[in-house]
């Protein structure tokens, strides 16, 4: 699915060049490159690498400090926990009842290049961390993936199970592009 243009917005472009307020106004605009965004039920979780990566807490706190009210790390962590059902770790950083199972690739299953990288990181003084989404510090760790029994679990698979698909107030329309979201007075989305 990842390479199939039917499952992507093929004309999206983005600049990855850093720009700042003191950029030369006569400089040419930054180059644009293709921006991969899924156009399939389940979104990026249906086509990307099954990674279950959280951003660094300092990034969330910076967004809040720049005006994104409600985006502090402590505001977002409950939602990360609500989403996931961690199959490996049960602690204050992880959820146990969410719809998306997450697990880590055991070191015994790491390919040769990953083991070589781990050895190089170890020699460089980085420590092995059991979890990339736990206490945040520098180190190397097993990859956390949204996968169970060697099967991808996309948002569509996790949330749109057989019981949900039977709901009378749910219509799934693939091959359809949403142009507007309708919200009620409580700012809850009630239609498209």
Q: Which residues does each predicted region cover?
A:
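N-terminal redox-cofactor-binding region of secreted/periplasmic oxidoreductases
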Residues: 1-192
